[in-house]
Each structure stands twice: as structure tokens, then as C-alpha cells.
Amino acid sequence: MVADTKLYDCLEVRPEASEAELKKAYRKLALKYHPDKNPNGEKKFKEISLAYEVLSDPQRRKLYDQYGITEGNAAPPPPGAEGGPGAGFGGFPGAGPGGARTFHFNMGGPGGAQFFSASDPNDIFERVFGHAFAGGGGMGGGMGGMGGMDDDMDMDGGFGTRTRGGGMPGGFANMFGGGGAGPHARRSHPSFGGSRPSQPPAQNEVITRPLNVSLEDLFTGCTKKMKISRHIIDASGQSVKADRILEIKVKPGWKAGTKIKFAGEGDEKPDGTVQDIQFVLAEKPHPVFTRSGDDLRMQVELSLKEALLGFSKQISTIDGKKLKVSSSLPTQPGYEITYPGFGMPLPKNPSQRGNMIIECKVKFPTELTPAQKTAAEAF
């Protein structure tokens, strides 16, 4: 028999729930109520984060089951709660103005309360999922990224990174009747009897799929909508199939190999883990141009006469403009003409472009007439 069930009710589990069941419940609810996915879910997201933080720690859960939990006020904890005898969890300052949220277990008796400071819900999310939520907006401007994709155009490393903004306004008022956290209540590391080593983040399984894009779309930028089918765990615990449209904003100048990652958009597993989906950009072959970094290369075919006496040709650039290419001098096979600023946009500065390089390919005749042989010998 537990003293209080608010935290269990918040995670929609029974008080007898196992560690795996708690984690599964948190994952499901965190994805559902994360403010970047559900603009109205901020309060609920904070509540389930606190619930999971307490119940996933065996020592805290034991105390919660015995005594329940109450939000502290702005005053410092009573004597004995800050590292003295009987404090139990080391010194945790009270939630002063703008400070971290402080809670205590209702143990009764002078100096008997056991205090701890609630962590930033974003940190809890990262510890469980192994990354920040990939999306924009939400939680006081705390989450960066665009539609689930990495905003770094080189895209060699991590994905869906976030920057920390101010703390989340509001609080756990529905559960505990307390006021909101101060504007700087961003990050607090709980400690029970001294510093607790941080746990390595769980690594989600990543499902990789190709994203084929034409050279023209990579030149202008585009939006691709990808329909995916995934398996999710419904309220009854059964795995059901669900379709979803993922929107990918391809930026001008992106290169083959660019990775776009969507956190938590893959299959939900019975153990509570959720797969990530990662798209890897691939360039479709182009009939005229080949790409070399930010440069575009193409070939112009010349007859032997044009190679010897000069030529004038009109070509089309990748964006459809007409460009005159000419020479009045003999042209060697493989000779290259470079036109700066007619290549691909630079990913980090799309207003600038690479080069267009034109290679002259001389077409030699397969046979010569007697007159041509005589002319060639005279030449």
C-alpha cells in the first residue's frame, strides 16, 4: 500500500509497475506531450518528467511510496535538510525566487523532511531518449532545429540539437498546488547523499532511408514530403500500424550524404524504446552536369574543324540561363573553361555560388577522305 499515487497516475501506471513499464510509459507520454510536438502539452510534460524522475530512482520511489511528496516553498529547507544528520539526500536549497523547484517527502518530525530539486524536464528527456527533441519552438524557445532536421548544413555530426532558453513558466500546480518556477529555473542536478554520477544516455535504434533529390532541387532548395508507416503501441498495449507524413526542407546547396534525422518517429517497441528515422540525401544523376563539391562540370563536344579553327556555342546553365562559349584559337582535347559564380549555391552562404567548369571534348573523325589527308599533311 502506497501513501500517494499522484505520480503513478500521472504516468498512467499501477504502483506495482516495473522499471521497464515506467520507462515505457514515460517515453510514450513524453513524445505525446512534448511542447515541440504538442503546444498545449507543456504543463503535462513537466508533470510526467517529475513523476518519472522520482519513480525511476529506487531510493526516491521508496520514500515516495512511504510518505508522498509535496512541493517546497520559497523558504530554505528546515535545519537538518542541508546535509546534516538525517538529511538523507545531501544539501538541496529551497526554491528561492528564480531558483530550481524543490520538493520534499512528507516524513514528519523536526528536520525529518527529505528535500530534492527537480531536474530540467529537457535533461530528463535527453537522458531517456539520448538526444533532444528534434523540432522548433516550444518550452521558452528552448528547442532549435527545423522540422526535425539538423540545421547545420555540413551535417557531419549530431542531429536535432537544441539550445537552452529560459526556464519553463508555470509549474506543477495541478498536482501539488504550488506556484510556477522562476524564469531561470533551467537546470538542477539532483543528488542523494552526494553527487550522483550521470547515466549514459540511451541510444535509440536508427532506421536509415535514402532521400533521392534532383540536382535542380538541390540548386533551388525544396520541400519533400515522405509518407512512412510505423508501428505504435496503443492504449491497450497492442502494436498497431499508423501512417505519418514527414516533411523535409532541403536547403540550397546541400550535398549527397547530408543526413536528416527525425527523433522518435520510427516504430515503438514493447520495451518502451522508439526508433529514430534518418534520411540520407542522394543526388539523382543529371543528363548534362556532374557535381564536384560546389562546382558543376559539363562537356562541350567540338569537331576537329572547330578545335582547330575556333568555335562559338550556346549552353544552358543549371538555372536555365543561356551562356555563350567561344574561342578563336585552337583548342586542345580536355581543355577546361571556368565560369565563376555559375555553379551550386554554397550551403552556408547560398547567395554565393561555385564555378561551372566546361571541358572541351574533341571528336576526331573515324576516317579521312584523300582530300582531307592531303589537307592535314599540308597543315
Curated annotation (Swiss-Prot):
Look up the record and give one Gene Ontology term from the biological process aspect. Answer: chaperone cofactor-dependent protein refolding
Coiled-coil intervals? none
Alphabetical list of Gene3D superfamilies matching this protein: DnaJ domain, Urease metallochaperone UreE, N-terminal domain
A molecular function annotated in GO for this UniProt entry is:
Hsp70 protein binding
Pfam families annotated for this entry? Answer: DnaJ, DnaJ_C
Q: Which InterPro entries match?
A: DnaJ_C, DnaJ_domain, DnaJ_domain_CS, DnaJ_subfamily_B, HSP40/DnaJ_pept-bd, J_dom_sf
Residues annotated as signal peptide = none
Instruction: Indicate the segments forming the J domain, all copies.
Output: 1-70
Q: Which GO terms describe its cellular component?
A: cytosol; nucleus; protein aggregate center
Q: Does the keyword Chaperone apply?
A: yes
Q: Does the keyword Chaperone apply?
A: yes
Region annotated Disordered, chain positions = 69-95, 176-205
Entry keywords, A to Z: Chaperone
Function according to Swiss-Prot or TrEMBL: Required for nuclear migration during mitosis. It is required for the normal initiation of translation.
Q: What is this protein called?
A: Protein psi1
What organism is recorded for this protein? Schizosaccharomyces pombe (strain 972 / ATCC 24843)
What lineage is on file? Eukaryota, Fungi, Dikarya, Ascomycota, Taphrinomycotina
Q: Gene name on record?
A: psi1
